[in-house]
UniProtKB/Swiss-Prot annotation:
PROSITE patterns the UniProt entry points to: FBOX
Domain F-box, chain residue ranges per copy: 6-52
InterPro entries: F-box-assoc_dom_typ1, F-box-assoc_interact_dom, F-box-like_dom_sf, F-box_dom, SCF_F-box_component
Source species of the chain: Arabidopsis thaliana (Mouse-ear cress)
Range of residues in the leader sequence: none
Pfam family, one: F-box
Full protein name: Putative F-box protein At3g17480
Domain of life per record: Eukaryota
Length: 374
């Protein structure tokens, strides 16, 4: 009788080993680095890293930045539509060595995520961190702290690898500049030839999709006889150019309505719309994005919030499987104490989870672990 015997990995060809490893989730692969020199060499190869990101089954971790801390969350939405209360548990806290305040926690005003990398920025610090591999890259900046900065992280998409870059908006009230930081050369350069025909509000959070960054921007235009001043625009890190203005799936004004942008697993975009003097909230999702152009939208959710109203600055992510969305914002109570509140919303369902202490200025996002090197 014939028996099947397992073959040791050492007798497999390198191509076959690479093909097997390219299908293993990133969080599992990092634990294999020290087990075999051949595997470690493969895992450090930029060509393999790109292949792995394109091939392996993605892991999605819900993250929360609050009170200078970054924590992973366990969000259970099953049963939301059957009147079963959902649950949220703050799990492992991620600490980045060196990026510490006096309390020993991660200090950051904003976090931007792209392909498993987290970009932390405040008035004095720029650091990129891959929590999966533990790698960090501290970036020097000579810009004065008095200038207003806005950052985005993306990559130049080449055939064999991806070259990562940071885009920085600098505005001191009189002068406006764009700068690019290239990871390969560890240097900044000014983008003199790029024209800006919009205003980027301080509260507009950029979102990364397939290496490019998208924002909701302000630019007064007349559409069908009505004044509309909110559009979607993008920055292509390969061409280093802004894309055309794309109309949102609703007519709105940045100055009065609540609008917030999010990414759906870094593959598509979603946008929240809460019209002034209305208790109805809508979330729309892009159907397709080709060459940085959003071609169409679908309405994902429409909910009557009854007495609640969101404010600009709210962050959120959606759960397509459970037809739900999770939001976070700071809310004062009757004693003017600030609480960080998480809202879980489904079709005709609203659940509230109070994280109690604050203020946090919480920022929610979905993180995709990767082997990307910095």
């Amino acid at each position: 009788m014939m028996t099947l015997q397992s073959s040791p990995m050492s007798v497999l060809t390198e191509d076959l080993v690479e093909d097997i490893l390219s299908r293993v989730p990133a969080t599992s692969l990092v634990r294999l680095r020290s087990t075999c020199k051949q595997w470690n060499a493969i895992l450090n190869d930029r060509r393999f890293i790109k292949k792995h990101f394109d091939t392996a089954e993605k892991e999605y971790l819900d993250m929360l930045l609050r009170s200078l801390r970054v924590s992973s969350m366990s969000v259970n939405l099953h049963g939301l539509h059957d009147n079963i209360d959902p649950s949220i548990e703050l799990k492992r806290e991620l600490n980045l060595k060196g990026l510490l305040c006096n309390s020993g926690k991660v200090e950051s005003f904003e976090v931007f995520h792209c392909n498993g990398l987290l970009l932390f920025t405040n008035t004095s610090t720029i650091v990129v961190w891959n929590p999966c591999t533990g790698q960090t890259k501290w970036i020097q900046t000579e810009s004065a702290n008095t200038r207003y900065h806005k950052y985005a992280l993306g990559y130049e998409n080449k055939n064999l690898c991806r070259d990562y870059k940071i885009l920085r908006f600098l505005d001191d009230g009189t002068n406006f500049e764009l700068e690019i930081y290239e990871f390969n050369s560890s240097s900044w350069r000014v983008l003199d030839s790029v024209e800006i025909d919009f205003e980027l509000d301080i509260g507009s959070q950029g979102m990364s999709v397939k290496g490019n960054t998208y924002w909701i921007v302000i630019d007064d235009h007349e559409v069908d006889g009505e004044l509309v001043n909110c559009f979607l625009t993008s920055f292509d890190f390969t061409r280093e150019r802004f894309g055309p203005h794309v109309c949102l799936p609703f007519q709105t004004s940045w100055y009065s309505d609540v609008i917030s942008l999010s990414s759906v697993r870094e593959e598509r975009l979603s946008v929240l719309f809460h019209e002034e003097d209305s208790l109805t909230m809508e979330i729309w999702v892009t159907n397709d994005i080709t060459d940085t152009i959003v071609t169409s939208w679908s309405k994902f959710l429409r909910v009557d919030l009854y007495t609640h109203r969101f404010y600009n600055g709210v962050t959120f992510f959606i759960d397509e499987e459970n037809k739900a969305a999770v939001f976070s914002e700071d809310v004062p109570d009757d004693s003017d104490d600030i609480h960080s509140i998480v809202y879980i919303i489904g079709q005709d369902r609203l659940r509230i989870v109070d994280l109690e202490d604050g203020p946090f200025w919480p920022q929610m996002f979905c993180y995709v672990p990767s082997l990307v090197q910095i």
